[in-house]
Swiss-Prot record:
Skewed-composition ranges (Low complexity): 90-99, 150-162
Highest taxon, organism lineage: Eukaryota
Keywords attached to this entry: Lysosome, Membrane, Phosphoprotein
UniProt name for this protein: BLOC-1-related complex subunit 6
Residue numbers bearing the Phosphoserine modification: S168, S199
Subunit structure: Component of the BLOC-one-related complex (BORC) which is composed of BLOC1S1, BLOC1S2, BORCS5, BORCS6, BORCS7, BORCS8, KXD1 and SNAPIN.
Compositionally biased residues, Acidic residues: 138-149
Residues that bear Phosphothreonine: T196
UniProt keyword Membrane present: yes
Amino acid sequence: MESSRGRPGPETDLLAVAEHQALVFGGGPGRTSSEPPAGLRVSGEEETENVGGANRHPRTSPKTSSCGVVHRPEREALENEPGPQGTLSGAGSRRGAPGAEHEPSLSSRHKNPAPPEGKPSSGRDCRRGGPGGGMDVEQQEEEDNDEEAAAGSRAGRSFSSRLQDSRSLDGLSEACGGAGSSGSAESGAGGGRRATISSPLELEGTVSRHGDLTHFVANNLQLKIRLSGAPPPPPSAPARPCPAPAPTPTPAIPPIDPEVLRDLERLSRELGGRVDRLLRGLGGAVQELTALSVGCIQTYRDAVDSLGEAVDMSIKGMYTLLARCEELERALQPVQGLARQVRDIRRTLEVLEALCK
């Protein structure tokens, strides 16, 4: 289609094609000249951008193909052709022309409705406003960067609303593709100073851009971390009517014999009685051992007491014996004098005996 329209054809063919498109886009021959058709409006913008040099960067080819525009030879033929179509294209392509007076009504009339659920947004939905309004916004973007930021934020909001309306992965991918084309168009309108980044991140948080930096703030980060760490819940079964309760199957374990329970109770009682008697005997043995220990302690105490008394009596007897010996020594002092006299007498007798011989 592009190759066939890229080359200029005969003038008659171009006029026929232009009249056919004017009838299709205009809704009939009775359409007024105050509302130009969409194809001629887009062609007027492109002719102004390419010929007048309003922007430093030309529009890309996907925009021309998505909006269904007429190629330059056809536009030249339409401009040269006298009639309402040539007047409309000239009014859409020239700034400050009388056709610009109808720009507010055109932009308000041609606002894109919100895309229905399940339908991807096309390149024409990404383009907002009429031709004159788009040219005014582009001129304001070239003059002031604040207007460019406002246009970028509006494009991001429209993209996020389109993504929220999408209910399938295919719609989401196509919406991303449409937003990418709108982002490329806005970047071309801004003179290549900044590329608008539109991604599904805007659904998960807040995306802010400062120059070349893109900041992303996630919503409910702790909840997302908790959900990512928690095991997935089991799929809930679909609600269905409650069937009649099935008969309970017979258990595989046979019924318990009551005699076994009685024997178990009797044996438990006997075991409890034996344990009680054992505990009582153990308590009596402990008491006997305690009494024996007390008797041994008392006997030891009595032995120690009697030994102490005996030692005390022996000490007292020794001291008494010493006293008696001292008394005896004092009593034997005269005997020593008698012994000396006896020795003197014996010596005298020996001397007398020697004289007698």
